[in-house]
């Protein structure tokens, strides 16, 4: 995990990112966690991400944010999650920091795209992951082709009804 985890706190993360930046490497910062079912936990996750955004700005490091909607309350309530993510995206926009949406399992796919669609009405600093093994991936790439996209294989075991089984 040490090769992909920059640290367990913000000072460790800043130091790791600075070292990578010295080698011309830009970084993605992901506050690990997903599938949150408690409002307070989702709010804590939001506050942690806002602190990371402040640290990126304060230390002038080359990094952007990656987030998972379920960590910010998607399984609790769509509007609650939207408000949490909007606060993050707005703060990041203020500092010209990009925010990438990680995609989760198929049951969260469309609600995550709905969040992106709604946020993109006011913000241009968002992008998304497209999981290539979903049957709908080509359509999603076409729809979001003007966004910053990261195409990935996909890490979740998905049913045959929605995804290719041989990766």
Show the residue positions of the predicted features.
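Positively charged, amphipathic and often flexible ligand-engagement surfaces
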Residues: 1-167
């Amino acid at each position: 995990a040490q090769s992909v985890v920059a640290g367990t706190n913000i000072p460790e993360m800043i130091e790791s990112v600075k070292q990578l930046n010295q080698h011309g490497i830009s970084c993605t910062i992901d506050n690990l966690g997903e599938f949150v079912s408690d409002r307070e936990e989702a709010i804590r996750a939001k506050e942690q991400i806002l602190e990371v955004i402040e640290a990126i700005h304060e230390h002038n490091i080359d990094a952007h944010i990656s987030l998972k909607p379920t960590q910010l309350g998607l399984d609790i309530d769509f509007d609650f999650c939207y408000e949490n993510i909007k606060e993050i995206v707005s703060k990041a926009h203020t500092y010209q920091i990009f925010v990438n949406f990680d995609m989760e399992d198929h049951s969260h796919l469309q609600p995550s795209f709905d969040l992106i669609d709604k946020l993109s009405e006011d913000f241009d600093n968002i992008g998304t992951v497209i999981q290539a093994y979903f049957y709908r991936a080509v359509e999603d790439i076409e729809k979001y082709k003007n966004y910053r996209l990261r195409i990935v294989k996909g890490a979740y075991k998905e049913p045959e009804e929605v995804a290719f089984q041989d990766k």
